From Swiss-Prot:
<dbReference type="GO" id="GO:0071555">
    <property type="term" value="P:cell wall organization"/>
</dbReference>
<feature type="repeat" description="LRR 8">
    <location>
        <begin position="301"/>
        <end position="323"/>
    </location>
</feature>
<keyword id="KW-0677">Repeat</keyword>
<keyword id="KW-0134">Cell wall</keyword>
<dbReference type="GO" id="GO:0009860">
    <property type="term" value="P:pollen tube growth"/>
</dbReference>
<feature type="repeat" description="LRR 7">
    <location>
        <begin position="276"/>
        <end position="299"/>
    </location>
</feature>
<feature type="compositionally biased region" description="Pro residues">
    <location>
        <begin position="482"/>
        <end position="504"/>
    </location>
</feature>
<dbReference type="GO" id="GO:0005576">
    <property type="term" value="C:extracellular region"/>
</dbReference>
<feature type="repeat" description="LRR 6">
    <location>
        <begin position="253"/>
        <end position="275"/>
    </location>
</feature>
<feature type="compositionally biased region" description="Pro residues">
    <location>
        <begin position="421"/>
        <end position="466"/>
    </location>
</feature>
<dbReference type="GO" id="GO:0005199">
    <property type="term" value="F:structural constituent of cell wall"/>
</dbReference>
<feature type="repeat" description="LRR 9">
    <location>
        <begin position="324"/>
        <end position="347"/>
    </location>
</feature>
<keyword id="KW-0964">Secreted</keyword>
<keyword id="KW-0732">Signal</keyword>
<keyword id="KW-0379">Hydroxylation</keyword>
<feature type="glycosylation site" description="N-linked (GlcNAc...) asparagine">
    <location>
        <position position="106"/>
    </location>
</feature>
<dbReference type="InterPro" id="IPR032675">
    <property type="entry name" value="LRR_dom_sf"/>
</dbReference>
Length: 699
C-alpha cells in the first residue's frame, strides 16, 4: 500500500480476568466490543471526524484566520517567561493543544507549563536579531499522526523558520495569520487533509526555500507569483489544482517541481527552458496537452522528466537530445506519434526510457528493448510498431496516425494556434470555389433569371409568389433529405469507437478525449461537404438581391407553416441550421461583392427573355437556398432577432459547428478505451525528504 494511504494502526490488548467463566452470550458481547474498540483505533480519521474538526476551526478562527494585534494582552497568564516572544509562543502552543482532536502517540502530552522549549516537537534557538534571546525557531511533528486543526494563534510565533507537519491528520485551512511568520524557511504540511484554495500565505514569506503541499485537498488556481519566489523545492502533487501552469514557471530557480496527480490543463510553458537549476520535473497524470515545446531540450541539468498520463500529441522534439544529464524519461500514456529518435536513446546518462501506450510507428535501433543499449530499461508496449510484440491493432492506430499533427502550428509548441481550427477555415474556401465553377457551366440560366427580375421587378410579384408556392414542395423534400445524412453522420461516428479495440489501455483515456480536438482538423473535411450546400448558395444569392425584393413583401409568410414542421428537426440535429439561417441575410452583402461576377455574365441576360422556362430547373437549385431563409428566417426573426447581429461574423460560423461536432464525437471514442486492469503506481521513485532542522546561522 502506498505510504501516503497507510492506515495508522495501533494495537490494543484487552485482558479479561474473571473468577467465573462467562456465558457464551456475555463472552461474545465482550469479544465483539473489544473488536470494535480496536478497529476504531486502527482506522484513520473518518470524514465525519474531519468535518467536525473543520467546524471547530471555523468557529474559533477570527475573520479570515487573522489575529488582532492585542491578542496576547487578552490572555491572563500567571506564569513568568524569559521574554515576550516565549510568552507569545506559549499562547500559540496552548491554543494548538486545545485544537487537537486525537494524539495517539501522546506527542503533545508534555505541552504544559511555561517551559515551551521542552515541549516535544518544539525547537528553540537564539533569535536571529538578538543572540541573547531564546525563541521558538521551529516545530517538527512529522509522523505523529495527530488529528486537529491549525489555530490562528500560531501566527504569534513570529520567529519560526521551520514548520514540519507531514504525515498527520490535520484538517481545515492554513490560517491567514501565518503571513506573520516572515522568517519561514521550510514549510511542510504534506500528507494531511488540508482543504481550501492555494495557501497564499507563502507569497508573504521572503526567505522560504522549501514548500511542500503534497497529498492534501487544496484546490483552485496556483498563483503565478509562486514561481517568482526563491524556492528550491515546490511540491504540489496529489491535490485538486485545476489551473494552467503559469508562464512564470521559467522564472523559478527551483531544482525540484512536481505537478503530478492534479487537474492542470493547457500546455507546458515554453519558458521552462529558462530553469537552469532544474533537476526534476514531474507533470504526470494531469490534463496537459498539445505538443512538447522544443525548449525542453535546454534543460541540460534535468535528471528526471516525467510527462506520463496526459494528452500530449505530435512528435518528440529533436531537441530532447539536449537532456544530457537525464536519467529517467517517462512519456507513456499520451498520443505521441512518429518515431522515437535514435539519438535520444543514446543519451549518456539515460537509465530508463518509458514510451509505452502511445502511437509511435517507428523507433531507432538503440531504442528497441534488448537491443544495443541493454543497460537501459526500455518499454515500448502498446504502440504501433509493426515488428514489436504487444502493440495496438491496426484499426486502433489508424484513428490517430491517419490524422497527423503539425506541431509547427500548435500553440503549445510555438505556433499561432492549433491546427484544428485553421483547417476548417481553409476547407470552406475551396468549397465556394467549386460552386463558383458550377454556376459557370450554367451561367445562362441564372443570368436569364435575374434579367427578367430586374427588368420587371414589380410585374413579377405574381409569378414570384407562384414560385415560392412551388418551392415549398422541393424545399420540404430537400430539408428532409439533408437532415437524413446529418443523423447518418452521428450514427457513423459512434461506429469507429466500437471497431477500435482500446479497452486494454490502462491509462485514463480522458486525455485521449481532450486531445481528439486537434486530430479532427483533418476530419473536418467531411463536414464542409455537408455544409457545402450553404456555401454554394451564397454565389446563388447573387440573383437573390432581386429576390430580396420578394422578402420584403410577406409573400414568404406561407412557407413558415411548413417550416415549423421541419424547424424542430434542425434544432434536434444540430445548431448549424439556425446558425446558417442568419448567414443568408448576412451573406447578402457578400453576394453583392460576388455579384460583380454575375454582372459580367449579365451581358447575356437581355437575349433570352424566355427565362420562365429555365427558372423551373433553376428553382430546383435555389430551393435549398431559398428554403432555408423562409423556413428558418421566421424562427430567427420571431424568436431570436438579436442573434443575427451576434452572428455578423458568418465566415467563422462554418468552422465552429465543425469543432463542436468533433468535440462531441471524441467522447464517443473516449468511453470505448477505458480499462483499469493495469494500475500505474504513484510516482514515489524520487522522494524529496523533509530536511532535518535547519543548520543555518543563528539556529
Amino acid at each position: 500500500m502506498p505510504f501516503y494511504k497507510q492506515p495508522w494502526v495501533f494495537s490494543k490488548v484487552f485482558v479479561l480476568a474473571m473468577a467465573k467463566p462467562p456465558s457464551f452470550g456475555c463472552c461474545f458481547f465482550l469479544l465483539f466490543f473489544s473488536f470494535l474498540s480496536s478497529s476504531f483505533v486502527s482506522f484513520a480519521l473518518t470524514d465525519t471526524e474531519a468535518a467536525f474538526i473543520v467546524q471547530r476551526q471555523l468557529l474559533t478562527l477570527p475573520d479570515n484566520g487573522e489575529l488582532p494585534d492585542d491578542i496576547e494582552y487578552e490572555v491572563d497568564l500567571k506564569a513568568t517567561f524569559a521574554n515576550t516572544r516565549l510568552k507569545r509562543a506559549y499562547i500559540a502552543l496552548q491554543a494548538w493543544k486545545k485544537a487537537i482532536f486525537s494524539d495517539p502517540f501522546n506527542t503533545t502530552g508534555n505541552w504544559h507549563g511555561p517551559h515551551v522549549c521542552g515541549y516535544t516537537g518544539v525547537v528553540c534557538a537564539p533569535a536571529l536579531d538578538d543572540s541573547d534571546v531564546t525563541v521558538v525557531a521551529g516545530v517538527d511533528l512529522n509522523g505523529a499522526d495527530i488529528a486537529g486543526h491549525l489555530p490562528a494563534e500560531l501566527g504569534l510565533m513570529t520567529d519560526v523558520a521551520m514548520f514540519h507537519l507531514n504525515s498527520n491528520r490535520f484538517c481545515g485551512i492554513i490560517p491567514k495569520s501565518f503571513e506573520k511568520l516572515k522568517l519561514m524557511h521550510e514549510f511542510d504540511v504534506s500528507n494531511n487533509r488540508f482543504v481550501g484554495p492555494f495557501p497564499n500565505v507563502v507569497l508573504s514569506w521572503p526567505d522560504v526555500k522549501y514548500f511542500d503541499l503534497r497529498f492534501n485537498d487544496f484546490e483552485g488556481q496556483v498563483p503565478p507569483e509562486l514561481f517568482k519566489k526563491e524556492l528550491d523545492a515546490i511540491f504540489l502533487n496529489d491535490n485538486r489544482f485545476t489551473s494552467v501552469i503559469p508562464e512564470s514557471l521559467g522564472e523559478s530557480p527551483a531544482s525540484v517541481v512536481t505537478f503530478a496527480n492534479n487537474k492542470f490543463t493547457g500546455c507546458i510553458p515554453k519558458s521552462i527552458g529558462n530553469m537552469k537549476n532544474l533537476n526534476e520535473i514531474v507533470f504526470m497524470d494531469n490534463d496537459l496537452g498539445g505538443c512538447f515545446p522544443s525548449e525542453i531540450g535546454k534543460l541540460s541539468n534535468v535528471t528526471v522528466f516525467d510527462a506520463s498520463k496526459n494528452s500530449f500529441i505530435g512528435r518528440l522534439p529533436t531537441s530532447f537530445v539536449g537532456l544530457t544529464s537525464v536519467e529517467e524519461i517517462d512519456i507513456s500514456g499520451n498520443k505521441l506519434t512518429g518515431l522515437v529518435p535514435h539519438n535520444i536513446c543514446q543519451l549518456p546518462n539515460l537509465v530508463n526510457l518509458t514510451y509505452s501506450y502511445n502511437y509511435f510507428s517507428g523507433q531507432g535501433g538503440s531504442c528497441v528493448p534488448g537491443g544495443s543499449r541493454k543497460e537501459i530499461a526500455l518499454d515500448d508496449t502498446r504502440n504501433c510498431l509493426a515488428s514489436r510484440p504487444e502493440q495496438r491493432s491496426a484499426q486502433e492506430c489508424a484513428v490517430v496516425i491517419n490524422r497527423p499533427v503539425d506541431c509547427s502550428k500548435d500553440k503549445c509548441a510555438g505556433g499561432s494556434s492549433t491546427p484544428s481550427k485553421p483547417s476548417p477555415v481553409h476547407k470552406p474556401t475551396p468549397v465556394p470555389t467549386t460552386p463558383v465553377h458550377k454556376p459557370t457551366p450554367v451561367p445562362t440560366t441564372p443570368v436569364q433569371k435575374p434579367s427578367p427580375v430586374p427588368t420587371t421587378p414589380v410585374q413579377k410579384p405574381s409569378p414570384v409568389p407562384t414560385t415560392p408556392v412551388h418551392e415549398p414542395s422541393p424545399v420540404l423534400a430537400t430539408p428532409v433529405d439533408k437532415p437524413s445524412p446529418v443523423p447518418s453522420r452521428p450514427v457513423q461516428k459512434p461506429q469507429p469507437p466500437k471497431e477500435s479495440p482500446q479497452p486494454d489501455d490502462p491509462y485514463d483515456q480522458s486525455p485521449v478525449t481532450k486531445r481528439r480536438s486537434p486530430p479532427p482538423a483533418p476530419v473536418n473535411s467531411p463536414p464542409p461537404p455537408v455544409y457545402s450546400p450553404p456555401p454554394p448558395p451564397p454565389p446563388v444569392h447573387s440573383p437573390p438581391p432581386p429576390v430580396h425584393s420578394p422578402p420584403p413583401p410577406p409573400v414568404y409568410s406561407p412557407p413558415p407553416p411548413p417550416p415549423p414542421v421541419h424547424s424542430p428537426p434542425p434544432p434536434v440535429f444540430s445548431p448549424p441550421p439556425p446558425v446558417y439561417s442568419p448567414p443568408p441575410p448576412v451573406h447578402s452583402p457578400p453576394p453583392p461583392v460576388h455579384s460583380p461576377p454575375p454582372p459580367a455574365p449579365v451581358h447575356s441576360p437581355p437575349p433570352p427573355v424566355h427565362s420562365p422556362p429555365p427558372p423551373p430547373p433553376v428553382y430546383s437549385p435555389p430551393p435549398p437556398v431559398f428554403s432555408p431563409p423562409p423556413s428558418q428566417s421566421p424562427p430567427v426573426v420571431y424568436s431570436p432577432p438579436p442573434r443575427p447581429p451576434k452572428i455578423n461574423s458568418p465566415p467563422v460560423q462554418s468552422p465552429p459547428p465543425a469543432p463542436v461536432e468533433k468535440k462531441e464525437t471524441p467522447p464517443a471514442h473516449a468511453p470505448a478505451p477505458s480499462d483499469d486492469e493495469f494500475i500505474i503506481p504513484p510516482f514515489i521513485g524520487h522522494q524529496y525528504a523533509s530536511p532535518p532542522p535547519p543548520m543555518f546561522a543563528g539556529y
